[in-house]
Amino acid sequence: MRVLLALGGNAMTSADGRARPEDQIAAAQVAAGAVADLLRRDVEVVVTHGNGPQVGNLLVKNELSAAVVPPVPLDWCGAQTQATLGNVLMNALEAAMAERGLDRPTAALVTRALVDADDPGFAHPPKPIGRFLPAEEAAVLVEHGETWEDRGAKGWRRVVASPEPLEILDAPAVRALVDAGFVVVANGGGGIPTVREADGSLRGVEAVIDKDLRAALLARTLGADVLLVGTD
């Protein structure tokens, strides 16, 4: 049996929602124990995860430093959190397997999700992310190409597209590793939203992919028998 375990971003934080490094490591250890128990029953497990709180932390760093250094684009934030959480989860998985006498290799893949450049969400971004800011602070980020909306008394808030994922571009690598016996962490945060240009080249775009759509697409792509969604 092949299972896709989709961990929400909040499942990678403490019970009260804090996302300090030690909180995320502790949460990963809890999730890894459950995965190792499935592996001990000869169940194939692929792990994917959200990254909302983690990207949120990076956005705050962007906001605080925007007057000094250019903000890191959202697709780069997604790539950074995929790598960080992938590393944390691999360490936790290997420790949990060792405790149970299991010897399985692990791998974490920075994964891209193909979206349509003409998706209507890009023309009218519907997804609010990050903190509310006063107009003068939001204006600095608008100068760097971000889209912010006036939300009245609360202040200004950034909005981004939420396109439908069409394809997990790195699914063949995920499938090959799973078939070779690896416990794989992949498609974190729904994958890095990526568009294909007319010349065939690929380009990351600033967007957020719905967590349920991304998990369902990955499960179908990998031929998973079961999709498990873990939350806090």
Regions found by a protein language model. Give the residues of each.
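Short beta-strand segments
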Residues: 6-8, 48-49, 105-112, 186-188, ...
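Catalytic-site beta-strand/loop segments enriched in glycine and acidic/polar residues
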Residues: 6-13, 168, 175-213
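A glycine- and small-aliphatic-rich helix-loop capping segment at beta-alpha/alpha-beta transitions
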Residues: 21-24, 60-70, 123-131, 199-207
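Glycine-rich phosphate/pyrophosphate-binding loops
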Residues: 191, 222-232
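Alpha-helix C-terminal capping segments
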Residues: 34-41, 88-98, 217-225
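Gly/Ser/Thr-rich active-site loops/lids in small-molecule metabolic enzymes
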Residues: 24-31, 72, 200-226
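N-terminal glycine-/serine-/threonine-rich phosphate-binding loop
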Residues: 1-48, 58-59, 63, 176-181
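Ligand-binding beta-strand-loop-alpha-helix segment within the catalytic cores
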Residues: 64-184
